[in-house]
């Protein structure tokens, strides 16, 4: 089901009407649904919804906690980029054990580097870089491509910041 624009109550009605099993959302959609009155939030049957995936922006811890409380442990999160550098993922249980996490690396070789391109200590934020088999290139824009590559050309970034904890 594709919505022309997101309206929180309409989304819930469509889940019920079409017995949606899987849905892709962004954190803003969660926030908007959580602002609905309780009677509206609980008016629609979501029992067919098995997996709700979210990405595209950081999800505030409080919002995700409230969504898991409301929908149960069906919420999954991933981090990646259109450029295809790498991919991390976590389910509700993994997230609850590490609130704020975007999961463990599933694809790519992750490196968190400081401003000197040195590995950042565990728990210290740094720029997210991935070493991939096929680095991406911006179409007809070699200067921009060069800005997103390590000096040796083996790693790429989109400029996001993150950190790795002791559990990876």
Residues covered by each model-derived region:
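Conserved loop-to-helix N-cap of the C-terminal "lid" that shapes the substrate pocket in Rossmann-like
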Residues: 5, 20, 99, 155-158
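Short, P/G- and charge-enriched loop/turn segments at secondary-structure junctions
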Residues: 94-101, 148-150
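Short beta->alpha linker loops
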Residues: 6-7, 28, 58
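Conserved ATP-binding/catalytic segment of the ANL
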Residues: 105, 121-123, 127-168
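Gly/Ser/Thr-rich phosphate-binding loop
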Residues: 1, 12, 17-25, 34-98, ...
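Ser/Thr-centric signal marking residues that sit
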Residues: 21, 28, 82, 145, ...
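Acidic/polar helix N-cap motif
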Residues: 7, 114-116, 141, 145
